[in-house]
Each structure stands twice: as C-alpha cells, then as structure tokens.
Amino acid sequence: MSGPLDRFTSPCFSNNGEKREKKSDFEVSEDEKKTRIGGILKKKSSKSKFRHSLKRRGSRSIDRTLSLTFEDIHDAEELRYVSEFRQSLISDHLLPPNLDDYHIMLRFLFARKFDLGKAKLMWTNMIQWRRDFGTDTILEDFEFPELDEVLRYYPQGYHGVDKEGRPVYIERLGKVDASKLMQVTTLERYLRYHVKEFEKTITVKFPACCIAAKRHIDSSTTILDVQGLGLKNFTKTARDLIIQLQKIDSDNYPETLHRMFIINAGSGFKLLWGTVKSFLDPKTVSKIHVLGNKYQNKLLEMIDASQLPDFFGGTCTCADQGGCMRSDKGPWKDSEILKMGRSGGTFCRHAGAFLSSDSQISSSDKPTYSLKVSDTSTAKSGSELEEMASPKTNTNNHVPKLTPVSEYANGNISPTVLSEYEECVPMVDKVVDVAWQLQEMPNASEGPQYTSSLGKIGSVRHIWSWLTAFFISFFTLLASLALPQTKEHSQLHSSSVRAELCDERIARESRPPSPPRSTITERVIISSVLSRLGDLEKQIENLHSRKSEMPHEKEELLNAAVYRVDALEAELITTKKALHEALIRQEELLGYIDRQKEAKCRRKKFCW
C-alpha cells in the first residue's frame, strides 16, 4: 500500500569551526527562547572531485523558475535515533545515495518500534530485495501494456488528494475477478507493475503533492469499496496475490498508510471486523474506518467533493479521461508542478538535521525539489533565485541524485569553508532546546514507551495481513457452509473458533491492561491464522477435486439395487392386483351366501 520527499537531500557536516545564525521567521517568547544552530558545507580536499556544485558552471543563463522554501522541523529524539541508525548503516555500507534520507530511515525505525537491531535487519532485507527485484531501474526497464485489461478486472488507482494534500488511493474489491486477471497477465508481471507504481508514487506523486500542499507528504489515504465482495473474489489465486502484495508493501515500504476507509461494509463484515480489530494495536485501529452504505458524509469530511469520484458521493467524473479510475487525477498531472520539481524550483530548509561523528548538528547541502514542511514558508528573493540554479549533474534527470556516501563517510572533508557557496547553503532554521543534548539516548528496550509519546504515526504494517486473514476466514466459512459434505465439519470448526475467541476475549478483559503486543507475537498469531485457513482451503479443494463419476464397482452395485427395486415394485403390483381380485371374489361369495339365506327363509314361510 512510502516515499519520503527529501530522499535526494544529502546531509553535510560541520566542524567545530565557523557557524552562522539566521534570524527567525517567527517570534518566540522569553520562556520558549531556543538556540539556533547552523552549519555550512565544508570544502572537500583538492584531491577529491566536488561533483555536486551548488552553482551552475559554464553557462551564465539564469533560471527564473519560482523557488519556494519550506522548513522541516525534526523532533530531537527522533533525530538522535535516525542519526545513530544512519551511522550504523554507513559503517556497514548499507546506505545507497537514493535512500540516504531522514524520513525513509525514520519510517523503518517506526516500523520496528525504534529497535535499531530489528530496523537494521529490516533495512538489510529491503536493500537485498531491491537488488534482486531490480527496483532501482524498474521505472525505465519495465513496461506494462496490458494495463487497460488489468484495470477492467482489478479496478484500482489514485484519484485526487484529501484535504491535507495526501494522494487518495482507491480499490473496488467487489469488482475484482482474479481468474480473469491472471488470464490477461501473470502474477509475476502484476507484482512488478505494483512495485513500479509504488516507486512512481514515491518519486513523482508524493513530491508533487508536497509542492501543491506546501507541506511534507509521504503517506496516502486509501478507500476500499467492498460492495459486491463475495466468494468469487477470494479464490486461491486472489489469496496468493494479496499475500504477496502485502509482503512487498510491509517489508519494503513501511508506514505509508495514513488513513483507510472500508465502505459499503455489510453487517457480517462489521461483525467479523469487530473480532479482528481486538487483535490490532489501537493506533492501527484508529486509522481504519469501517463504514456501511452511508459513508458519503464521512468521506467528504476528509476529501473535497471535487477530488472525490461521483460514485462515492463527489462531483468528479473525469468523463474526458475514461472515468475516474483511469484518469490518475492529481497534482502530479500539473505540468507546472512537475517542471518546478524537475528544475529544483523548490528549496528545502531543514529545521534540524543529522548528527555528525563529533556530535554537532549539520544541515542540508543543496536544494532539492522535495519539500520539508513546517508551519512557516518563505519565498526566495530575486538574487537568491539566480543563485538557486539546479546542479549540472541533475539537469538531465527527472530525479536529482544525492551526494555519494563516500564523500562524507570517509572523513576526508577539508575544514576550509567554501565562501563562494555560503549564500547557497541552507542554514538550520530549527529552534532547538539546548537541554535536549544533555538528555540520555533512550534504550532500544524503551522503544514502545517512546513511540507511545510520539503519537503521530501509528503502526499499520500488519493491516493487510489482518484484512487478508479476515476476508479469507469469512469467505472460507461461507464456502464450507455451502457444501453439504462439509457442513458438520464447518459447524464444529466455527464453534471451536468462536469458543477460542470468546475465551481469549474473556481472559483479555479479566486481566489488567498490558502493553501492546510485540511484533513477534503478532507475527505468530498471523502465521497461525493463515496456517489454519490454508488447511481449510486444502480440504475444500480436495472436496472440489473429487471425481463426480461413481466408481465402476459401486455403480454396478447401485444398478443391481435399482433392478432389485424395480423387480420388487413389479411383484408388489402383481400382489396388489391379486389381492384386488381376491377381494372382488370375496364380495361375490358374500353376496351369494346372503341370497341363499333369503331363499331359505322364503321356503320356510311358504311351508307354514
């Protein structure tokens, strides 16, 4: 279901030498007076190549593109965690330039509750996956000509932004036909298409939303329409597809979901959701809103009507682009915004940056089209606009590159300051509390308590796992009830599941509140649920795969029994006929006897 917007900003380091202060863009009270710390780029040794010049050399042409400046305020504790995590990655050569970004590393730390060891393992697996999958070049290498057919059988895509500027992703699960989807493409090709769209979202959509909203955007709002969702939608193919998509998203693009709406949910859906959400973290549950068929007002609270498709209660139809699901509407379709991004027309002022090896704070070294956000923003003056021309190395690329790690990791940076670049180097505008440097670094074991104090980004990496288990359990139960051969088994299994859930719920309610479940416990539960569902699915498949034709021996026995029944029926008919004739004969005899008695009585009277 991601993309930090300052992924192309490389940090630079300041020594114990010169520092420069800039005036604040906002006033602070005496009680809130903070220390302003700034850093400037150090000039490299003459033996090293300074490849990422901040001034355009050679040509004296001036880029008149409007330059916008925004601040990105970093939390002090988060900054310390990210700095330590970053240094650990650099020491093990695990930080490629395109991933050397504050927000990317922060998302991985959030995904592992600020456990540096687990976050590093997750990061290592992600790096290896990108190499094996070819993710870094997938935008250029992979083509997907069957997209129109795929969207017919799996309607999904981005459409517009919410009121906070985040892109809105829509899936109409009730119209998914996995069998036909696999006829027009393959599972492997669809997974590659999914990764390509995710990379496009990170490198194009999120930066465009950031420019349009003038704030940092690296997450999305999702709408899942479950109207018409039935057993036909959740075949084994659909299950394999969902599980693999979920694994890719949660392992390699963590913490990218801001909010999810599940609309047109029926009563059965809501009942099962009430059970499933008891296993989820409260922060995760707070991001998921399960709505019935009266969802329009809730959606319109979060998304403007002009950005919402008409079939969801909005006013947008995208009639000239083949409908809303095919239009890919959003700021990323605005040529001016794309031009501004590609030309480096937006400038990021970092309020707080990485800690160098000597524990000094340093700032960003160059402009980048990705925006870091705070509540304040300023526009560059005319002279600054001339100074802010994008570097030569980036003029031919849609995506500017970072300064290589080797240029700041080898420790060969000269302490001499480049005076000619002083005006181009952004200063740190963060208002920093002096006392925070004296605080102890929280231990890894204190990660959960620390994350609970942050309260900004909830863990959502298991949402798709739980939803997958939820959907499959619901429809597997329906399938079991629909088969007479497995009715008794389904009832017993359903009873046992309800009993287990009831016992667990009672036990949970009876014990005192405990900390949130650990990641390992959640993984064990998910694995157990999916394993049991897999066993049930195999049993159902075995029942479906049994031959409908009866074995020859049993067929002969059945035919013999049928013939015997036919013979018995014939004998019964003959017996009935004989009995009927006997009854007629009996009636005749009784009539004859009665006539003889009457004749005898008449003779006696005549004699008298």
Swiss-Prot record:
Ranges annotated as biased composition (Basic and acidic residues): 17-33
Region span, Disordered: 1-33, 358-403
Compositional bias segments (type: Polar residues): 371-381
Principal cellular location given in the protein's record: Golgi
Biological process according to GO: protein transport
Cell location: Golgi apparatus membrane; Cell membrane
UniProt KW keywords: Cell membrane, Coiled coil, Golgi apparatus, Membrane, Protein transport, Transport
Coiled-coil residues: 526-572
CRAL-TRIO domain location: 146-320
GO annotations of cellular component type: Golgi membrane; plasma membrane
Mode of membrane association: Peripheral membrane protein
Annotated family: Belongs to the SFH family.
Alphabetized PANTHER family for the sequence: CRAL-TRIO DOMAIN-CONTAINING PROTEIN YKL091C-RELATED (PTHR45657), PHOSPHATIDYLINOSITOL_PHOSPHATIDYLCHOLINE TRANSFER PROTEIN SFH4 (PTHR45657:SF18)
Described purpose of this protein according to its UniProt entry: Required for transport of secretory proteins from the Golgi complex. Catalyzes the transfer of phosphatidylinositol and phosphatidylcholine between membranes in vitro.
Name of the protein in its database record: Phosphatidylinositol/phosphatidylcholine transfer protein SFH4
Organism of derivation: Arabidopsis thaliana
